[in-house]
Amino acid sequence: MVGAGDQLRNWNFGKPLFAECEVPGFSTFEAPIAAKLMPYAATMPYDQSNAIAPEPSMTPPARVGTQTDILGESPVWDERAACLYWVDIRRPAIRQLNAASGAVQTWPMPALVGCIALVDDGRLLVALPQQIALFDPRDASLEAFVEPPPMPPEHRFNDGRCDRQGRFWVGSMHNVTRAPEGVLYCLEGRSLRAVRSGVCIPNSLAFSPNGATMYFADSLRYSLYAYDYDGATGVMGPERVLASTEPPGFPDGSTVDAEGFLWNAEFNAARLVRYAPDGRIDRIVVMPVQRPTCCAFGGANLEVLYVTTASQNMTADERAAQPLAGALLALDVGVRGLPESRFALAGPKLQHIKTP
């Protein structure tokens, strides 16, 4: 008997996933292939007690801009500037989408950029391999900020996110072997501390609306984890498995919506999964690309879900079959997000701690 994981692993992306038609500034897509992908989304053997009810997004994904990323990641919405920032890790750059005009600006970076975070003074925190830097999009200046402990060769930062008090959590990884040599760090002001070692691919860093729950994934362990989180001290509680995925799909980047549900981009599985706080799968959104990487809510009312994607290591046939691989996508999923937390240059803002 062929399992659902084998079915998806052997999926033939030999035909376009969505039929494309042009509208001003975007490409929209019909979704006839969704019916074919839905069985995989519905039957992959997750350790869940509930029935999974896949449902498509309220509107099909739309391409934003014409750029193609090798490994798009770390989307963050800046509500002050009404723009979305994200990175291309492999072709090192920070990108900015102007929501009003639709224009995309690109700033090349000097080294692999794992992730970014908003800063309370309007700049961006940038996780480079041997330096956590500050980037100012107003004048394109890049300033050294914190030098982490020396990383072994071929190591880099990957996913990162600020907690509700303004600490920056970021994980490192081996860029080639993905061996369990990575470290999860927490940055408070200019003080960087190692919290956890033995990480393969750090991902899915996110926090519940009240900041009392922290989420994290080590992608190659095919699990999403949750922790009680003390915002006053920045200390994680005991680890518990929120949900597990089945190869070939593994958890990549996440965001939390205003209802407290976790949206996770499942790399290699062509889908976004919305998890309830108890780990129950609430919704599955089929994507037109095999490798969604991360997601973030944006727009004037935080009603648009932006999704970064990857085109790396794809054959010519795969690229032809998935013309949106590497694109920034936008869709309406019927819920709103939360404002992105900003890094506090002067240290954690403890007055921002909220009770459940």
Task: Set out the residue ranges of the language-model regions.
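A short beta-strand motif characteristic of beta-propeller blades
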Residues: P60-G65, G102-P108, E143-P150, S191-S197, ...
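A short loop-to-beta-strand structural motif that recurs across blades of beta-propeller domains
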Residues: A93-R95, Q131, V183-Y185, S223-Y225, ...
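Short loop/turn segments immediately following beta-strands, especially the blade-tip
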Residues: Y227-G234, V333-G337
